[in-house]
Swiss-Prot record:
The keyword Cytoplasm applies. Residues 281-310 are annotated as: Disordered. InterPro entries: PCRF (IPR005139), Pep_chain_release_fac_I (IPR000352), Pep_chain_release_fac_I_sf (IPR045853), Prokaryotic/Mito_RF (IPR050057), RF-1 (IPR004373). This is Peptide chain release factor 1. It comes from Stenotrophomonas maltophilia (strain K279a). The keyword Hydrolase does not apply. It is found in: Cytoplasm. SMART domains: PCRF (SM00937). Gene3D superfamilies: 3.30.160.20, 3.30.70.1660, 6.10.140.1950. The modification N5-methylglutamine is found at residue 235. Belongs to the prokaryotic/mitochondrial release factor family.
Amino acid sequence: MTPTLRRKLEALAERREELERLLAEPDVVADNTRFRDLSREFAQLEPIAIALADESRAKADLAAAEGMRADPDLRELADEEIAAAQARLLELEQELALLLVPRDPRDEGNLFLEVRAGTGGDEAAIFAGDLFRMYARYAERQGWKVEIESDNPGEHGGYKEVVARVVGRGAFSRLKFESGTHRVQRVPATESQGRIHTSAATVAIIPEADEVDDIVINPADLKVDTFRSSGAGGQHVNKTESAIRITHVPTGVVVECQTERSQHANRDKAMKRLKAQLLDAERQRQDAAQAESRRLQVGSGDRSQRIRTYNFPQGRITDHRVEGLTLYDLPNILAGDLDPLLQRLSHEHQVDALAQLSAG
């Protein structure tokens, strides 16, 4: 472990001890907000304290085993214990390094999933539908809930656009690297010559932020349109203009909601999503400025970036952000078995974040 990382660990250990003292003070206990915030910070630092204590014990075990080597009768046993202690220390060093990677406070929250057909006409819409089903199936495996907020079906299947809210613990942490352009290579069902066509769809993963209630939007900046819903709710929704489309004029961000029976409920949902989008756009701008010099763009969330290719003739899926990340398991991945991809992307992101910490 580099001296820089070791210093960071020591500083966090000191902060944890300080928090322990603060949480025992009567005035802190009496202040519910401060007590909650400090308790949350303490809980985040506790795994580091536990790992450091384990490391101290492993170092003591190593020293004791090395002392045993002076006795010829115990040398073989000592060598075994030395090897075990060294392996444990290496394991703990890696664990501590990963614990240093700053946690994204949005990781445990819900998200908005937006899938839009790109270039490729009908085939792009069909592919957008494939992607949406892939994420919906993955969400089902995790026990998450998927609520469609608005959709625009393609003429021959799939979606020109579909927006859904994904509700479940850790949803954003799992799917946050999916934003970007996804490309498909396959022979369309309507292709009589057997030629491979290339089309694309874009995916946006937007965290549902707790802070949206604090965002103030000038009503003069909004253009609100109502229209007849084509979504859930049966015949009733088609009889009244209950669906809402809100345009944030300064940024051009447009959101729709048509899933509720009442215009008021649709407006509330649309405003919540608009605020989440504006907050996410500002965070992306800040992240892009900070990440300008970074090698790896796994966590950039840039929706214009081509991140992945799905090649049907070869049954291959390639993620272009990570060298060598190609899997020949396309049917299972489209069926919702995304973990082999998502875990590798998460690991690469952690490695990159550690490199930034070491350089800092």
